[in-house]
């Protein structure tokens, strides 16, 4: 019996880049999935981007190369794009269209979901709380990641954001709930070398067992990058809200995703916005970022770390600029620190985690965490200002206290920010190291820390006696 939802047409009116246009069609819905069969028998998947009463424009996820406009058959399936979901996806590796590439069989679905998901009702959202430990001091100590938060990393071409992304995904953990934690990692527009690096990192560290990998390669059709993050987020929603897991979603590189959006907009001859990006890029990015969060009455959570490269290191570029309006802070990587050989090159001064206060303190990290963080920011900022002054005027006018701040600044970069790519520091390790650095300064300078904590952790006299000013 023929399924009336399926309508098949032969021939394509026009092909433009990754898009094809069909005329003479009826009853086609926006977002509907199409099966495109080439004359040689190859089947590709497409999705309706635009429709009228007699015309449909379809984006083809594997590209339009070798597509015959006369003999190609297009079957519309009458439903949006969906993904088969199962808890058995943990430990598996998929391409950017959710096809297995690890040699394993297809996923036996426990359920099938629309990849565009359902928006979380604002009244049902629960405020993000409790932390995720990444093992990286510049994040855990200064910009703590909170469950349910979306905290992007702003990087630049040539900076080690891929290494940082793999380290976060390997080391991230929820204290005391290891069995309920999972990572969904989606990479868009990466090279074969980068793909092999991610797979090797997860396999050798054993982190693959709790990870779902989606890898879209640079030579895959750019149009596929539109669906890769949505496949990842739908998987995360299933693990979080159906299975009660705390899920960390790492998306890299969102700039490649936005380039794919720009390519589609150009093919559709849309009026361009800033720098040629479509005018709806803000809304489109929000449809990804706002899928993070917690739902009242549900155990799980979705935390996002989107990673994007800033063209020419320009933080006012539309992609990082609009991302900053939607997300709850940012981690900024510094080319100056990278030139000094410091990894990870996190420039803590422009960094911010707006929800940090909900994830630190007694019973979560440590009671002194907030005050230590504030004092570190203050001391490091003063050290940076003094180093800028020294570069212009020399060290002759510096007081002994100024020299202590410069010493603190150097130690902060080399001991606190710098760490090995396989060095996993606990919150306690990070805060203990912070007190070692703050003890370089006189006790009277720690004006942002209460006397109670200074009595408990400060040991400046011993350090000054051993090492001098």
Swiss-Prot record:
Signal peptide range in chain numbering: none
Compartmental location: Cell membrane
GO biological process, one term: proton motive force-driven plasma membrane ATP synthesis
Keywords: ATP synthesis, Cell membrane, Hydrogen ion transport, Ion transport, Membrane, Transport
GO terms under cellular component: plasma membrane
Topology of this chain in the membrane: Peripheral membrane protein
CDD domains xref list: ATP-synt_V_A-type_beta_C, ATP-synt_V_A-type_beta_N, V_A-ATPase_B
Pfam families according to UniProt: ATP-synt_ab, ATP-synt_ab_N, ATP-synt_VA_C
Gene Ontology terms for molecular function: ATP binding; proton-transporting ATP synthase activity, rotational mechanism
Family annotation (PANTHER family): V-TYPE PROTON ATPASE SUBUNIT B (PTHR43389:SF4)
Family that this chain belongs to: Belongs to the ATPase alpha/beta chains family.
Assembly mode: Has multiple subunits with at least A(3), B(3), C, D, E, F, H, I and proteolipid K(x).
Protein function: Component of the A-type ATP synthase that produces ATP from ADP in the presence of a proton gradient across the membrane. The B chain is a regulatory subunit.
UniProt name for this protein: A-type ATP synthase subunit B 3
Organismal lineage: Archaea, Methanobacteriati, Methanobacteriota, Stenosarchaea group, Methanomicrobia
């Amino acid at each position: 019996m023929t399924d009336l939802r399926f309508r098949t047409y032969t021939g394509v009116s026009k092909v433009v880049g990754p898009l094809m246009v069909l005329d003479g069609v009826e009853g086609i819905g926006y977002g509907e999935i199409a099966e495109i069969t080439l004359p040689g028998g190859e089947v590709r998947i497409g999705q309706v981007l635009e429709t009228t009463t007699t015309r449909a424009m379809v984006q083809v996820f594997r590209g339009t190369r070798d597509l015959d406009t006369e003999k190609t058959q297009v079957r519309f399936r009458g439903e949006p794009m969906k993904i088969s979901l199962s808890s058995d996806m943990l430990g598996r590796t998929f391409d950017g269209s959710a096809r297995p590439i690890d040699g394993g069989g297809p996923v036996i679905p426990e359920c099938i979901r629309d990849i565009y998901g359902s928006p979380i009702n604002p009244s049902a959202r629960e405020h993000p709380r409790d932390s995720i430990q990444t093992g990286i001091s510049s994040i855990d100590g200064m910009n703590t990641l909170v469950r349910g938060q979306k905290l992007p990393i702003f990087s630049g071409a040539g900076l080690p954001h891929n290494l940082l992304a793999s380290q976060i995904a390997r080391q991230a953990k929820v204290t005391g709930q290891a069995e309920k934690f999972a990572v969904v990692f989606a990479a868009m527009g990466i090279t074969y070398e980068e793909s092999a690096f991610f797979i090797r990192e997860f396999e050798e560290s054993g982190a693959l067992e709790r990870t779902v990998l989606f890898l879209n390669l640079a030579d895959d059709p750019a149009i596929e990058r539109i669906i890769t993050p949505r496949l990842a987020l739908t998987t995360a929603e299933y693990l979080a809200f159906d299975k009660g897991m705390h899920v960390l979603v790492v998306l890299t590189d969102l700039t490649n995703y936005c380039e794919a959006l720009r390519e589609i907009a150009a093919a559709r001859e849309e009026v361009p916005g800033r720098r040629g990006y479509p005018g709806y890029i803000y809304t489109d990015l929000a449809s990804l970022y706002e899928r993070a969060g917690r739902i009242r009455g549900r155990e799980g959570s979705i935390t996002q770390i989107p990673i994007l490269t800033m063209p020419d290191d320009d933080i006012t570029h539309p992609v990082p600029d609009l991302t900053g309006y939607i997300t709850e802070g940012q981690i900024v990587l510094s080319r100056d620190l990278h030139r000094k050989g410091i990894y990870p090159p996190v420039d803590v001064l422009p960094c911010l985690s707006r929800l940090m206060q909900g994830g630190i303190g007694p019973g979560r990290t440590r009671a002194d965490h907030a005050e230590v963080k504030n004092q570190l920011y203050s001391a490091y900022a003063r050290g940076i200002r003094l180093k800028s002054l020294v570069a212009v005027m020399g060290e002759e006018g510096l007081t002994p206290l100024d020299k202590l701040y410069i010493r603190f600044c150097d130690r902060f970069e080399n001991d606190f920010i710098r760490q090995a790519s396989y060095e996993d520091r606990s919150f306690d390790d990070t805060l203990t190291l912070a007190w070692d650095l703050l003890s370089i300064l006189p006790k009277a300078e720690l004006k942002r820390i209460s006397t109670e904590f200074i009595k408990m952790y400060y040991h400046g006299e011993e350090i000054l006696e051993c090492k001098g000013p």
